[in-house]
């Protein structure tokens, strides 16, 4: 230790816990809002931080403490010495043989948010695939919002109340110890409502403009701003415009084939796109496509 001093008990030097108190006080002040860390740090590390801050500043260092639980890998504790570990960039690149398939940063983030931060989380290939599929479902529903038909004067009041109830519930869930898993479950309920009304536009009752606006804000606010999920597939800028334009040309060719009753060509285009993780859906109001990975 470079910092040493003589005391009446023995040679003194800074303890292992003091650096955290020193850094937080310097950069965040005597008291800040949220202190994070793993559950294994509750004792002795965080208890020592509290004791140090009371001694030096006369107050608690943080208003709230968030202790995350362990992240398992295929049901086992991560251990570099046992070869059971994986790095974030290895997940994104698919360069680790434990989980050899690559996953987007948003899919990995969504996977983690589906569990409460104080729950044990098991990182597996199947769980990541399920999260990937779930994220695609929410993104697809968000994309359909702009295509929903408004039936003025014939709105389903019960559904409108359900939408508002789910939104109110999301505020309650996030206020209750950041319960992201319940919030995401409610977003799936809203996605189901969007799909029902998109696939059945001729129903006697429908959504009014206010409800569609509420749905839009719910996805933007909770999934986008709070949970930090990009609401479109993981392509940006010119790449996105290029993909949209290319798909428009391909689907026009497929539409021509169907118009000429050339079913083999139509099916071939759909199947080839499916192998590239692009899903084509034929609906009452036309054809839609989405990236399922």
Locate predicted features.
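Structural preference for alpha-helix termini/caps and helix-kink/transition segments
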Residues: 86-293
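Alpha-helical recognition segments enriched in aromatics with Gly/Pro capping
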Residues: 1-146
């Amino acid at each position: 230790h470079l910092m040493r001093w003589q005391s009446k008990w023995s040679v003194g030097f800074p303890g292992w816990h003091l650096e955290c108190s020193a850094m937080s006080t310097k950069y965040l002040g005597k008291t800040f809002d949220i202190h994070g860390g793993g559950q294994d740090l509750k004792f002795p590390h965080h208890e020592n931080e509290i004791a140090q801050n009371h001694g030096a500043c006369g107050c608690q260092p943080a208003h709230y403490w968030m202790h995350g639980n362990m992240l398992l890998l295929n049901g086992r504790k991560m251990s570099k010495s046992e070869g059971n570990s994986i790095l974030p960039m290895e997940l994104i690149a698919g360069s680790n043989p434990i989980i050899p398939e690559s996953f987007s940063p948003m899919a990995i983030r969504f996977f983690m948010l589906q569990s409460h931060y104080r729950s044990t989380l098991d990182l597996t290939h199947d769980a990541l695939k399920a999260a990937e599929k779930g994220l695609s479902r929410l993104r697809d529903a968000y994309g359909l919002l702009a295509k929903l038909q408004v039936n003025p004067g014939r709105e389903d009041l019960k559904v409108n109340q359900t939408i508002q109830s789910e939104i109110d519930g999301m505020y309650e869930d996030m206020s209750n110890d950041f319960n992201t898993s319940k919030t995401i479950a409610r977003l799936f309920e809203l996605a189901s409502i969007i799909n029902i009304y998109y696939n059945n536009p001729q129903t006697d009752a429908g959504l009014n403009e206010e409800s569609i606006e509420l749905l839009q804000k719910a996805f933007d606010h909770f999934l986008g701003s709070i949970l930090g999920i990009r609401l479109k597939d993981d392509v940006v800028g010119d790449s996105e415009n290029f993909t949209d334009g290319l798909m428009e040309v391909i689907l026009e060719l497929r539409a021509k084939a169907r118009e000429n009753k050339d079913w083999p060509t139509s099916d071939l285009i759909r199947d080839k796109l499916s192998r590239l993780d692009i899903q084509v859906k034929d609906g009452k109001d036309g054809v839609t496509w989405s990236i399922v990975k």
